[in-house]
A protein has these predicted regions:
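Alpha-helical transmembrane segments in multipass membrane proteins, preferentially the mid-helix core
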Residues: 172-180, 326-351, 404-406
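Hydrophobic transmembrane alpha-helical segments in integral membrane proteins
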Residues: 148-171, 320-332
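Non-cytosolic membrane-interface motifs at loop->transmembrane helix junctions
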Residues: 213-226, 318, 379-392
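Rhodanese-like catalytic fold shared by cysteine-dependent sulfurtransferases
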Residues: 3-43, 53, 61-99, 103-148
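Juxtamembrane "helix-exit" motif on the non-cytosolic side of transmembrane helices
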Residues: 203-216, 293-314, 368-380
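Hydrophobic alpha-helical transmembrane segments of multi-pass membrane proteins
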Residues: 189-210, 358-374
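Membrane-interfacial, low-structure loops and terminal tails that flank and connect transmembrane helices
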Residues: 2-4, 243-278, 412-426
């Protein structure tokens, strides 16, 4: 392997690893040291004979009344924050092991950390919050807590889980195998993008089968796989347009934009029109990224029946923090870096700027897709799931269609380009 390819592979792989681990680090810094229990562990503690454990609902009185939890004592977080001593607790909770729960498990974890600092307090946080509790057997088999779903919606749910999703996963594998021996940089990037996207979808399937879509870990792997997969695909599109259509990076080929520029940087000491347009697109994309950062977070979780089978629909707050906050802040940082490289680097600035731009576009596009479907269908998550899977099917199908339509030219090795763009690790 050439040194340039090894170096680029190191930076891309290192960036993916750092980008994947950063949310875990941020979560740890935010939540600090606390102990959490699963729904099963919490129920075992509560059901023990002479149990000294108590379930504490730290949501507001209004939220607790709207969606009550049997056996839970409502102790609102606003009051808990000023009552960190055993003597300040409600009498029914004194001397007991406390299991705190709220909508998402994040606020209860912070409160648990605060209460554990009080002498003699043993406090746990319910992992997953109400979303996990609603997925538990007691809530799932309480008819009054089941949201009705029409026959058409039940059919859509079945078609999504057993039709659309398996279809695009199988098609994705076929396209990956088709691209397996290709060495052109754009096709290699597309292959990696589809492979990482497929691994994310595998994590999604595991979350559905094993955890009933309540595992933040598997959902994070799903989200991260989609984001990185879209980034590689964006780079594949940019690289393919450059090398095969525009011919910007090929030093001996005539740039397709020369008719607009009249003079070309390849042949004269003039500013490059495409580079100047790129330097305007990047700041515009930064502005758009702030739309995600300003979007509100809405917790939603409910149980429903699908042809006699009880299932839980939820949009976890941890996932929304990734989609709306991380997928805006990280792209903003990458886009700023891309813009600075384009303005300040003298030798071949477009190639690294293009890589950084593609890295930013993936999570940004993923965040906007999630924002779009869950904003429209926030109260009917069956439709949100359907349109997300349908969009993913269109993504894979579009890649396959382009490869098939232009197969005679795409699978011919393109002319080498000048710069690292021709050195994408295979």
């Amino acid at each position: 392997m050439k040194p340039e390819r090894r170096r680029l592979g190191f930076w891309v792989g290192g960036g993916m690893l750092a980008g994947g681990l950063l949310p875990f680090l941020l979560y740890w810094l935010l939540m600090g040291d606390f102990s959490s229990v699963t729904v099963g562990q919490a129920k075992r503690l509560l059901e023990k004979t002479n149990s000294m454990a108590a379930l504490v609902d730290v949501r507001s009185p209004e939220a607790a009344a709207a969606n009550p939890v049997s056996g839970a004592v409502n102790w609102p977080a606003s009051i808990v924050s000023s009552s960190n001593r055993p003597a300040d607790m409600p009498p029914s909770l004194r001397g007991k092991t406390l299991i705190l729960m709220d909508e998402d498990g994040l606020g209860s974890a912070r409160i648990a950390r605060m209460l554990r600092s009080g002498e003699g307090l043993e406090v746990f946080s319910l992992s997953g919050g109400m979303a996990a509790w609603d997925a538990g057997p007691s809530a799932r088999h309480t008819p009054s807590r089941l949201r009705p779903m029409s026959i058409a919606q039940q059919c859509i749910a079945v078609a999504t889980g057993f039709g659309v999703k398996p279809a695009h996963m199988v098609l994705c594998v076929l396209v990956i195998l088709w691209l397996w021996r290709q060495r052109a940089p754009d096709l290699v990037a597309l292959r990696w993008g589809l492979l990482i996207f497929w691994l994310g979808e595998v994590a999604c399937a595991i979350n559905f089968v094993v955890a009933d879509e309540t595992s933040e870990f598997w959902e994070y792997l799903h989200n991260y796989g989609n984001s990185v997969g879209f980034s590689f695909t964006t780079f594949a599109v940019l690289e393919g347009l450059d090398r095969r259509v525009i011919k910007y990076s090929a030093p001996k080929d005539r740039c397709a934009a020369i008719g607009l520029c009249r003079a070309c940087i390849k042949y004269a000491d003039v500013p490059c029109g495409l580079r100047r347009i790129f330097s305007l697109i990047i700041p515009a994309t930064i502005v758009i990224a702030f739309m995600l950062l300003c979007a509100p977070i809405h917790f939603v979780s409910y149980n429903t029946g699908i042809f006699g089978s009880i299932t839980t629909y939820s949009h976890l707050v941890g996932s929304q923090l990734y989609e709306l906050r991380y997928c805006s802040l990280l792209p903003i940082a990458l886009l700023v870096a891309s813009w600075l490289v384009l303005l300040c680097r003298r030798r071949d600035p477009v190639t690294p700027a293009k890589i950084l731009f593609a890295a930013a576009t993936g999570p940004l596009a993923f965040g906007f897709v999630r924002l779009f479907v869950f904003s429209i269908y926030n109260d009917e998550l069956v439709w949100a799931n359907f349109w997300e899977e349908a969009t993913e099917f269109l993504y894979v199908f579009s890649a396959a269609a382009v490869l098939w339509i232009f197969r005679d030219s795409l699978f011919v090795k393109p002319a080498p380009a000048n710069g690292l763009a021709s050195s994408v690790p295979a």
